[in-house]
């Protein structure tokens, strides 16, 4: 039966857990549309790097 050979100390456990964290998504202001969008992605209005790339899904 698989059993840990040694007890895992609090310090060792907590050092491992320091990397378990959330990171906020990078958001940039788009001057063309005046909206915020995530970097390296097409905005909701269909713009990427100031140019119209795709059709926007407009709500009716």
From Swiss-Prot:
GO molecular function: structural constituent of ribosome
The keyword Cell inner membrane appears for this protein: no
SUPFAM superfamilies in the cross-refs: Zn-binding ribosomal proteins
Bias kind Basic residues: ranges: 7-20
InterPro entries, alphabetized: Ribosomal_bL32 (IPR002677), Ribosomal_bL32_bact (IPR044957), Ribosomal_zn-bd (IPR011332)
Biological process terms in GO annotation: translation
Keywords: Ribonucleoprotein, Ribosomal protein
Residue segments, region Disordered: 1-21
A cellular component term, taken from the record's GO annotations: large ribosomal subunit
Keyword Ribosomal protein: yes
NCBIfam families per the UniProt record, alphabetical: rpmF_bact
Protein family: Belongs to the bacterial ribosomal protein bL32 family.
Protein name: Large ribosomal subunit protein bL32
Source organism of this protein record: Streptococcus uberis (strain ATCC BAA-854 / 0140J)
Lineage: Bacteria, Bacillati, Bacillota, Bacilli, Lactobacillales
């Amino acid at each position: 039966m698989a059993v840990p050979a040694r007890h895992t100390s609090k310090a060792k456990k907590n050092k491992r857990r320091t990397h378990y964290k959330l990171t906020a998504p990078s958001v940039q202001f788009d001057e063309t549309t005046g909206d915020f969008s995530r970097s390296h992605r097409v905005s909701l209005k269909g713009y990427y790097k100031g140019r119209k790339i795709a059709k926007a899904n407009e709500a009716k």
